[in-house]
């Protein structure tokens, strides 16, 4: 385990890709009270809050392995998974944010339902706090189930099938795997995912456009939304993070 100060509330912010987490350091530098430590964590002594971050790679296996490693090293009080997702609800628009309440793997289908992985829902009090903070930040947020699978969802037909069977608000490739490991380790978990596309027949085109913007040095503000929401909520409701394990 690292030398993280357990007198602080420990928030772990994780992502699949570096670009989904790059904004964290820039954002904390512009906020009062934050200092970077020699362990590359971020501490706010007044708030008694510490943030650790980790990029674990794309897909469920990378997410599960990275989450287990993170928990063993840092013993966080709460894990927030930020990054992109495909929006599944009809009112969704690019840049809106999904606030996860519960998580399901759509490509895991054992014959007996009691063999399904055990995944705890996100703490309701923190989901509500994130929803309130989203409103204050003028971020359009939706709370609900997030579906996960080891594939890029870019088919309207497949999207509709997932909606019919699981009723999620968003689809990604990691959240349910992180949730499964966090549940096994008794660590509360929430996913905050910004809609990069609508997970339909136009999704591949949108992904290529985002990639081009990034490679040509253009900022993509929608990547910043989950980090702003996570940090602001943690600062405002730091006591809730400590209470999630009580």
State the predicted function of each range.
Residues 1-6:
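Basic/polar N-terminal segments that are highly enriched at the extreme N-terminus
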Residues 8-32, 50:
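Short, conserved "active-site rim" segments that organize catalytic pockets and cofactor/ligand binding
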Residues 8-11, 35-246:
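Glycine-rich phosphate- or other oxyanion-binding loops that anchor nucleotides, phosphorylated ligands
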């Amino acid at each position: 385990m690292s030398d993280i100060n357990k007198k602080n509330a420990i928030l772990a912010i994780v992502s699949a890709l570096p670009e989904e987490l790059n904004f964290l350091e820039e954002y904390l530098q512009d906020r009062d009270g934050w200092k970077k430590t020699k362990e590359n964590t971020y501490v706010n002594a007044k708030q008694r809050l510490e943030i650790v971050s980790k990029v674990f790679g794309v897909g469920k296996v990378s997410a599960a392995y990275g989450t287990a490693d993170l928990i063993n090293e840092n013993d966080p009080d709460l894990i927030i998974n930020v990054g992109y997702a495909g929006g599944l609800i009809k009112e969704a628009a690019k840049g809106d944010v999904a606030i996860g309440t519960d998580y399901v793997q759509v490509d895991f289908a054992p014959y007996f339902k009691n063999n399904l992985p055990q995944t705890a829902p996100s703490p309701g009090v923190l989901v509500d706090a994130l929803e309130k903070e989203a409103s204050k930040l003028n971020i359009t947020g939706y709370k609900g189930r997030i579906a996960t699978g080891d594939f890029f969802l870019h088919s309207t037909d497949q999207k509709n099938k997932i909606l019919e069977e699981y009723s999620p608000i968003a689809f990604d490739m990691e959240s349910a795997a992180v949730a499964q490991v966090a549940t096994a380790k008794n660590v509360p978990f929430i996913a905050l995912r910004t809609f990069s596309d609508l997970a339909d027949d136009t999704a591949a085109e949108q992904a290529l456009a985002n990639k081009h913007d990034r490679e040509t040095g253009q900022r993509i503000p929608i990547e910043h939304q989950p980090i702003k929401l996570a940090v602001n909520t943690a600062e405002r409701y730091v006591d809730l993070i400590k209470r999630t394990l009580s």
